[in-house]
């Protein structure tokens, strides 16, 4: 995920905490899509636009985007509940554009003047809702008017932009109402008991210094109306179980494992046996990492598992093909002028398809029907047979790409920009994974290296796309193995990050496996945190560079954990 953003679990935890600021009011459980709310939004939008049309300058576009939902957040550790909060939230984003599509208040550095946000009354009181929308609309008009003045001044005194595309694309209005049946929301007490049992699994592993089990449920209705005639109502539901376990090496390095279960139906919750097996594997991994030696800087052959390759492509390629990164004086524009040129080996293709809900039996986080600007989601062929073909576009045009392809996404309260949905890498020359490993060992021998590195799992990363910074990336592996040329058993190492520049590293892919793996996560960038998925087969790189990871010097706990709970749980686990 982009720049300073941390691993996906941490990002999601912060987002969940934000949704849990205030307790649920008993007055208003979430119901079916709300016709009264939608009618109030439409009425106030058109009333406001009619009044503001008398102003100079007048808006040429306005929209209301309302999210009406409820969430349940439970955080548990060692069999106890740390947090349990059920929250109802109803919030509005008011967007407004002054000027004309060719040049408006959102131009360049004033991009985020196009939105004002606030909370709406949770009760269906049309007068109260209309009054809040009126207030937000007036605040947004004042902000947009000032920004438009700034834009005109700056445009008049500075050199012409290299890309003089319009600031807003013309799109056909969309009308849609989700008819999906409402998903039953979990009962809070039952979930708390489930969280207790899940988190108690770690009590039998004294080597785990800290563990958390995070249960999250959210269902929402999303309403979008615009002066262009768009009227969309969609329903969403998501359920997640996230498990985190941490320990600390003797030298102070923090070691972490994170596993996630995601589903759209609460009936698909993992069983206690599944969670217990996951906890056991995580504890085993942490014990092995604790004993593992520190890795050294390395440059040579590398093999990425499918899951690791998926995260790698999200960071290294995905962010750089987002539409807004192709224009603006501050953007590095790595691939802007490489359309119809080769950027990957000819056996690789990349698509982004948010219309896919399931891939290979795994539910995808990046599924949606319409983006946050009201454009229908669509499959985008980004790279075909190694050749760059397209970018991920919202309604901000770039040179030679004048229309949205349904990728304008944002967290509530922020302006949408082009973002990834479900990024999928496919190979036309896949070989069985066993053969891929053999070819990896051959490459190690060919280069005269004593070993290569196998990256089994990656927790996240960041990429730099601003022009005033190196066009580089840093990916954060968790489980990394030395694979020896002489046939010795693989050896786990720790404290290593993958680093490099995209144009170089993407040209070093030599082969892929035949099994696709999926990574689901939360991606952070300038338009906030959005759910995404990435999928890819295992990949062999002829050359990859790694560096040592920075870590602290805090000592591990001096005292062992209390013996009673651990001993009792070990006895129960042995039954």
Residue ranges and their predicted role:
Residues 1-7:
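N-terminal secretory signal peptides that target proteins for export/translocation
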Residues 235, 392, 492-494:
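Short linear motifs in exposed loops
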């Amino acid at each position: 995920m982009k720049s300073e953003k941390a691993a996906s679990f941490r990002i999601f935890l912060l987002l969940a905490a934000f949704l849990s600021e205030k307790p649920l009011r008993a007055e208003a459980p979430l119901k079916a899509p709300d016709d009264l709310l939608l009618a109030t939004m439409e009425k106030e939008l058109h009333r406001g636009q009619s009044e503001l049309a008398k102003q100079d300058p007048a808006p040429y576009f306005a929209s209301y985007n309302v999210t009406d939902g409820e969430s349940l957040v439970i955080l548990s550790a060692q069999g106890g509940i740390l947090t349990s909060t059920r929250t109802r939230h109803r919030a509005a984003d008011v967007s407004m554009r002054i000027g004309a599509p060719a040049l408006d208040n959102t131009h360049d550095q004033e991009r985020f003047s196009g939105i004002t946000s606030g909370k709406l009354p949770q009760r269906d009181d049309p007068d109260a809702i209309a009054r809040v929308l009126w207030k937000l609309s007036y605040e947004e008009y004042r902000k947009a008017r000032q920004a438009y003045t700034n834009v005109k001044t700056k445009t008049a005194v500075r050199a012409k932009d290299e890309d003089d595309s319009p600031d807003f694309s013309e799109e056909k209005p969309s009308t849609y109402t989700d008819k999906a049946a409402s998903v039953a929301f979990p009962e809070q007490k039952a979930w708390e008991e489930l969280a207790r049992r899940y988190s108690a699994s770690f009590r039998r592993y004294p080597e785990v210094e800290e563990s958390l089990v995070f249960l999250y449920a959210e269902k929402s209705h999303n309403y979008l109306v615009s002066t262009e005639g768009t009227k969309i109502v969609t329903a969403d539901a998501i359920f997640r179980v996230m498990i985190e376990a941490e320990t600390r090496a003797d030298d102070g390095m923090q070691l972490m494992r994170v596993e996630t279960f995601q589903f759209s139906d609460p009936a698909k919750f993992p069983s206690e046996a599944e969670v217990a097996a996951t906890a056991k594997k995580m504890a085993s991994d942490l014990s092995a990492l604790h004993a593992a030696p520190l890795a050294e800087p390395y440059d040579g052959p590398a093999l990425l598992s499918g899951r690791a390759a998926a995260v790698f492509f999200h960071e290294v390629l995905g962010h750089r093909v987002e539409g807004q990164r192709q224009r603006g004086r501050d953007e590095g524009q790595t691939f802007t002028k490489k359309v119809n040129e080769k950027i990957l080996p000819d056996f690789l293709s990349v698509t982004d398809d948010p219309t896919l809900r399931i891939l290979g039996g795994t539910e995808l986080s990046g599924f949606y029907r319409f983006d946050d600007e009201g454009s229908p989601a669509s499959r985008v062929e980004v790279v075909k047979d190694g050749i760059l073909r397209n970018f991920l576009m919202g309604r901000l045009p770039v040179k030679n790409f004048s229309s949205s392809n349904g990728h304008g996404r944002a967290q509530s309260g922020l302006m949408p920009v082009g973002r990834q949905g479900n990024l999928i890498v496919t190979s036309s020359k896949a070989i069985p994974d066993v053969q891929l490993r053999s070819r990896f060992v051959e490459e190690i021998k060919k280069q005269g290296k004593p070993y290569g590195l196998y990256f089994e799992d990656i927790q996240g990363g960041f990429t730099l796309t601003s022009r005033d910074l190196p066009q580089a990336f840093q990916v954060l592996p968790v489980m990394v193995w030395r694979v020896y040329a002489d046939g010795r058993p693989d050896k786990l190492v720790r404290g290593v990050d993958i680093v490099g520049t995209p144009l170089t590293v993407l040209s070093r892919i030599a082969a892929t496996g035949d099994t696709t793996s999926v990574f689901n996560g939360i991606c952070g960038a300038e338009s906030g945190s959005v759910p995404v998925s990435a999928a890819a087969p295992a990949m062999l790189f002829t050359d990859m560079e790694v560096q040592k990871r920075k870590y602290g010097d805090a000592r591990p706990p001096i005292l062992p954990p209390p013996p009673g709970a651990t001993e009792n749980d070990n006895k129960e686990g042995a039954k």
